[in-house]
Amino acid sequence: MTHLACIAASDGIAIAKAYRFVQPNLTFSQTTVQDVQAEQQRLAAALAKTEQELRPSKQQTLKKFSAEEAAIFEAHLLVVKDSELIGPINQKTADEGVNAEFALHEVSSMFVALFESMDDEYMSARASDIKDVTNRILAHLLGAHIPNPSSISEQVIIVANDLTPSETAQLDRNFVLGFITDIGGRTSHSAIMGRSLEIPAVVGTGVATTTIQDGDILIVDGLSGQVFVNPTADVIVSYQEKAQSYHTQQAEWSTLVNEQTVSKDGVHVELAANIGSPGDLEGVLRHGAEGIGLYRTEFLYMGRENLPSEDEQFTAYQTVLEGMQGKPVVIRTLDLGGDKHLPYLPLQEEMNPFLGHRAIRLCLEQQELFRTPLRALLRASVYGNLKIMFPIIATIQEFRDAKAILLEEQEKLKAAGEEVSADIEIGMMVEIPATAVMADVFAKEVDFFSIGTNDLIQYTMAADRMNEKVSYLYQPYNPAFLRLIQMVIHAAHQEQKWVGMCGEMAGDELAVPLLLGLGLDEFSMSATSILKTRSLLKRLSVKDMQALATEALQVATAEEVMEKVKQAVK
């Protein structure tokens, strides 16, 4: 038995076989071949295996999603059988006596460059199809395996170096019981998505992919941050009992599902949920959320080969707004860039992508990328209580420009006879220290603030939240950071505006008492944290927590703040 200590990322306990999700090494050299026919047969075998791999993926996608998503795999199958692509590869092998890997790379690169140069969205998408299929064929030529999260059909625990947002979005929780990564922290996107999917997860192991083999029996303890590899029978029994205790506690919390969140001294605050897709609605309602405080719209764009249409986005937003039955739904406009990239939307490589051309900066430059989802949102607004917010706002001019585009699209829709709600609140994320410092200015023009602590902490402390070497500086309880939160809440309340928080701090047991004392109006978190947080808030007095917050703002270190919270709520 091997024991790994790591970072608890998503609550729960899972016991299952390991499924290594490790990208293969697809490097190769150009070689000269003597037997051209044998080399062409190698290519034919790789093509056949690729086709065998794609057909089940198409069928599974058709069952789980829709014909539109399944059409991606149909396009890939057409590439595999395209004589205009395969013919030149075989011809190059015959004419130049080169290996199939090299011929495949040279010919496919030529087609990719050709399609990417065309000023046509459909043809550009074909370039992505060729890249994807080429990698699959190359993997089979090299005897490697490209993992496909959507093809998993048995209960497993995924083991990966990291999981991108698009990969995590494809996980099916009926089969993926948990995951383990080498890198990342509690606020990394893989961790956030783990909580959204309600599956146990641990991150930052450092050695999972080098220690764990396919088929190993694993225990993932997402409560305390531990992994057991091939555990003994006694350890398995112990963790089965621990899992049962956890489920019992969840059942106790479930009695609070239909209750409002009211403090011990009668003050109501709102507990909302963070979501990434309409599929998350079931969990949101099951856990008794009083609204949605963050809908990450960029996940509509992931795990696919082209931009979602306006109608497709409209349907997603309509589904969520109707599903929440009049409860507030805060939808964030596109936050692409940083660590969220799309294969069909190439972005310039940057030295510091988190400080670069992302989110509202990208949208204000590529306005059609911005206007399409805005139109979809405005059309859907009549189906519920919609609030719209813009991410990564740094200056008041950015907010004004974004709002002007939104209002322009609203007027166009009205002129075309479309019905649009007259009561849409327009707010912004507070994720940049400059915004917090100028909150009094912003508060005069916004309808609300939502504090995005994940980015705001790393920008305040100059500490990359994905870098384990500086993780000690990622301090939600640092008095400097708490003072920024206080500034934002005070500025908003001076203008009778409300403040929410949609970062992971909003559901943190130690942070909740402080945030209640600082006057936070809305706590938005992973759905699985709502009932636990409601139980905690019902035991706290706002008056007592205000005194705690005042003390916390006067101390010098995060450690002192944490100690004061523990003493106050023990």
UniProtKB/Swiss-Prot annotation:
Pfam families with a match to the protein in the record: PEP-utilisers_N, PEP-utilizers, PEP-utilizers_C
EC numbers: 2.7.3.9
Co-factor(s): Mg(2+)
Kinase among keywords: yes
Binding residues for phosphoenolpyruvate: R296, R332, N454, D455, R465
Entry binding sites for Mg(2+): E431, D455
Any one GO molecular function term: phosphoenolpyruvate-protein phosphotransferase activity
Listed GO biological process terms: phosphoenolpyruvate-dependent sugar phosphotransferase system
Catalytic activity as recorded in UniProt: L-histidyl-[protein] + phosphoenolpyruvate = N(pros)-phospho-L-histidyl-[protein] + pyruvate
Residue numbers annotated as active site: H189, C502
GO (cellular component) term, any one: cytoplasm
Main location per the UniProt record: cytoplasm
InterPro entries per UniProt: PEP-util_enz_mobile_dom, PEP-utilizing_PTS_enzyme, PEP_util_C, PEP_util_CS, Phosphohistidine_dom_sf, PTS_EI, PTS_EI-like, PTS_EIN
Locations listed in the record: Cytoplasm
Other known facts: The reaction takes place in three steps, mediated by a phosphocarrier histidine residue located on the surface of the central domain. The two first partial reactions are catalyzed at an active site located on the N-terminal domain, and the third partial reaction is catalyzed at an active site located on the C-terminal domain. For catalytic turnover, the central domain swivels from the concave surface of the N-terminal domain to that of the C-terminal domain.
Domain remark text: The N-terminal domain contains the HPr binding site, the central domain the pyrophosphate/phosphate carrier histidine, and the C-terminal domain the pyruvate binding site.
General function of this protein: General (non sugar-specific) component of the phosphoenolpyruvate-dependent sugar phosphotransferase system (sugar PTS). This major carbohydrate active-transport system catalyzes the phosphorylation of incoming sugar substrates concomitantly with their translocation across the cell membrane. Enzyme I transfers the phosphoryl group from phosphoenolpyruvate (PEP) to the phosphoryl carrier protein (HPr).
Designated name of the protein: Phosphoenolpyruvate-protein phosphotransferase
